[in-house]
Amino acid sequence: NLLGGVVLRDMNGVQITGLANLVGGSMRGVQIAGISNVNGNNLSGVSISGLVGITGNHAQGVIFSGLTNITGDNTSGVIIGGLLNISGENSSGVHLAGLANIAGESFNGITTSGLLNIVGQSLRGIQISGLGNITGEDMHGMQISGLGNVVGGSFTGAQLAPMNMAKSGKGLQIGLFNYYKENFDGFQLGLVNANPDTKAQLMLFGGNTTKLNVGARFKNKLFYTILGGGTHYLDFSDKFSASLFYRAGLELPLYKQLFISGDLGFQHIENFKNKDYGFPARLYALQARVNLEYRLTDRLGILVT
């Protein structure tokens, strides 16, 4: 049909049109349209449209549209949308979208988008996006994104992004900033690993490498990380030099207010104008330390390295 194909009730077979296909009931078979495929009830089969694919209730099979796929209830199969895939309730299979995948309730399978994946309730599977992944309740599987992953409930599996957040979890959080609200059974690997009990502590100290240093220590029950910077890696008589450092370590109590800790750190050193006097423009260093700390109060302590 050159312009449009219209079936008021159910359709079993093949619809091919230059503009739009419309089925008032359920469609079983193959639909191909230059602009849109619209099914009032269910779809089972293959649907290919240039712009929009809409199914009022359940969709099962392979659905492709250049712009958007919308399903009122459940979706299973392979769904590919140039911009958006939206399913009102439960979804399973593989969803691929240039912009975003949105599932109103649960999702089982793999969902991949250029920007955002959203699951309103639970996820079992994998979310991969360029910007962020959001699961409203529990997740069993993996989230990978270019900016952030969020799980509103508990997750079992792994979160990989610059920022990872969850209510509770069991597994891995790998990123620059990792956070959980209640409890976590697993391993956090990041520049800052935080929870409601994490103490953010200001540190001021001197040393024989960088002479004057300031840092922020993010301390949990045993493990801690330190982010900071220092000045005058060279002597005070030389021109200005500075460094940035990151350290991760473990602290244990020795006696009452006395604690011992050990950490390993990376240091980036910039010599600035000293490079004109025979010094390298920049240096990199790995440094291990053993520290003794005495807590004078809950907010003040003395550290010797």
Q: Language-model segments: which ranges?
A:
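Transmembrane beta-strands of outer-membrane beta-barrel pores
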Residues: G4, A20-L22, S36, V52-I54, ...
